[in-house]
A protein has these predicted regions:
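Nuclease catalytic cores
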Residues: 1-147, 151, 170-172, 179, ...
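Basic side chains
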Residues: 52, 157, 178, 206-207
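The DNA-recognition helices of helix-turn-helix-type DNA-binding domains
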Residues: 77, 160, 209
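Anionic group-transfer/hydrolysis microenvironments
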Residues: 118, 144, 157-159, 206
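Flexible loop/turn segments at secondary-structure boundaries
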Residues: 122-124, 152, 160-163, 203
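Short beta-strand-loop-alpha-helix junction that forms the active-site gateway
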Residues: 156-167, 197
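Short, glycine/charged-enriched secondary-structure capping and boundary segments
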Residues: 167-169, 207
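Residue-level detector of conserved catalytic or cofactor/ligand-binding positions
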Residues: 198-212
């Protein structure tokens, strides 16, 4: 299965953060169709929040899930060149420690974890809220957890939105990720989750009937 995932869902480690965001644009754009407000240029505060969000994603990408001390874990990632000094400086050690102590992803014990899996898959345009036939969809799955022929997807968000707002905004995105995995791999996605890295809260969208 690991070889199959490597073939159909390709690791994204070689890509820089700005490339990562560009690759996610198509899925994010599809999710944005559920937003009530138009997308505007980022303010300075929003730009800082975005940079901190990218840094949090990088920390999570390389996180040893058995780590108990945030300072030691961040030092390890810095020493191994897994996270840059500028990104590390954006992170709050108390917030990271709270995340480690929360056990919010403890339910994934026993799963094989695949991180930062990017994909390209053809999907019917209506699933993205568009007209026409099939379109090519690109995206990155933050965390794909596999046990047997079943899978769980987790998407990380660093946002000021509360949990219900995150679900409303990104449930289509998670549905598209589920579709991509099940189309590309012999897996059945049992659950999808949004993990708010700012709230340290995990939510489960329930909109998958859109694309079943």
């Amino acid at each position: 299965l690991r070889e199959l995932i490597g073939k159909n869902l390709v690791y994204a480690y070689p890509f820089e953060a700005d490339t990562r965001l560009k690759l996610k644009t198509s899925v994010t754009a599809a999710a944005a169709k559920d937003e009530d407000e138009p997308m505007n240029y980022l303010s300075l505060d929003e730009e800082i929040t975005t940079e901190r969000g990218i840094a949090m994603h990088k920390f999570m990408e390389n996180l040893d899930f058995s780590a108990e001390d945030a300072a030691s874990e961040l030092s390890r990632q810095r020493a191994e060149g897994l996270i840059g000094e500028d990104q590390a400086a954006l992170l709050s050690l108390p917030a990271l420690q709270k995340l480690l102590e929360s056990g919010v992803l403890g339910f994934l014990n026993g799963y094989t974890l695949f991180r930062e899996q990017w994909f390209t898959v053809n999907v019917p345009a209506p699933l993205c809220g568009l007209e026409g036939g099939e379109i090519m969809l690109q995206g990155i799955i933050d965390l794909l957890a596999v046990k047997g022929d079943e899978a769980v997807l987790v998407d990380y968000k660093y946002s000021g939105k509360d949990a219900p707002s995150l679900v409303k905004t990104y449930e289509r995105q998670l549905s598209l990720y589920k579709y991509a995995v099940e189309k590309s791999l012999p897996l059945k996605v049992q659950k999808t989750y949004i993990l708010s890295l700012s709230l340290i809260h995990i939510s489960e969208p329930t909109r998958h009937s859109l694309i079943s």
